[in-house]
Amino acid sequence: CDITLPELAQLCDVFYIGGTKCGALCGEAVVFCGMHAPAHPIPRIKQHGALLAKGRLTGVQFEALFTDGLYFEIGRQAIETAQALRRVLHERGYQFFLETPTNQQFVILPNEDMVRIREHASIEYWEKYDETHTVVRFCTSWATTQEDIDALAAVL
């Protein structure tokens, strides 16, 4: 990552930190910076059914993830495997819908390739590109290995 959390907090009024792709069981941490927190956020969240009843579970996960840089180490693994996936897709001649340095890669697939790849890998429909192509999302996580990328390369 080329920005620190304190720098991000200076640049934003609010941001969130995802947990599941870094190994958390569930949850995201919403961070309000400075004086930008809304009035009474917890009751508002509860009223809309978006608060885990046992919120301590989510908090403990983030406490562990931010100990000794674990969150960033895990995130780096996801991004490195996503970039390896990107290279494989590029080598196979696939076009990218978006340029992204993250753990998510958005690829324009011929519809028949999408059907075939889905038999071997988990990909997410993103949007219809044209009559014969679809944009899909490939997403890596803390658990994605080079062996996973190699297995997908064999399918491609």
Language model features with spans:
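N-terminal hydrophobic targeting segments
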Residues: D2-I3, I108
